A protein has these predicted regions:
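Extended, low-polarity transmembrane helix blocks
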Residues: 1-36, 44-49, 53-56, 60-128
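Short, aromatic/His-centered strand-loop micro-motif at the edge of beta-sheets
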Residues: 39
Length: 128
C-alpha cells in the first residue's frame, strides 16, 4: 500500500489539520486579549491582534493569495519568538507541571512547536 501524499487523494487536504489546530489555538488565546485588561497593557492588545488575525489569515489563505498564508504564519511566528525570548527561555526546554510552579514555569517546548508549524506556513505558503 502506497501512502505517499502525491498518490493519496486525501493528502491534498492534510494541511487543513495544521491550519485548523494552529488557528484555533491562537484564536482561543488571542481574543481574550482584545477585550479584557489582562495586565499586559498595549503589548497584550498588540499580541492579541497578531494572534487572532494571524489565525484568520491561515484559515482564509487557501482561498486567497499565497501571501495571506505566509503573512498569517509570520504574524504567529513573531509572537512565538517574542514569547520564547521574553517569557519562556529562562525556564528551560521542558514544561514543568507541579503545584508550586503553576502558572509561570513553563519551558519553551510548546512555543517552539508552535513556532515550527507557523514557520512551515511562512516558508511553504499554500504549497504546504
Amino acid at each position: 500500500m502506497n501512502l505517499e501524499l502525491e498518490n493519496n487523494p486525501l493528502g491534498n487536504y492534510a494541511h487543513w489539520i495544521l491550519r485548523v489546530v494552529l488557528a484555533t489555538t491562537f484564536i482561543m488565546h488571542g481574543y481574550p486579549k482584545l477585550g479584557y485588561d489582562m495586565g499586559m497593557g498595549f503589548v497584550g492588545y498588540f499580541v492579541g491582534i497578531f494572534e487572532v488575525f494571524g489565525a484568520i489569515f491561515l484559515l482564509v489563505g487557501p482561498f486567497t493569495k499565497d501571501i495571506i498564508t505566509r503573512v498569517g504564519g509570520l504574524m504567529i511566528s513573531i509572537i512565538m519568538i517574542g514569547a520564547i525570548f521574553v517569557v519562556h527561555l529562562g525556564q528551560g526546554w521542558k514544561m514543568h507541571a507541579t503545584a508550586e510552579s503553576i502558572p509561570y514555569t513553563q519551558g519553551f517546548e510548546w512555543q517552539a512547536l508552535l513556532l515550527g508549524v507557523s514557520l512551515l506556513f511562512v516558508l511553504k505558503g499554500n504549497k504546504t
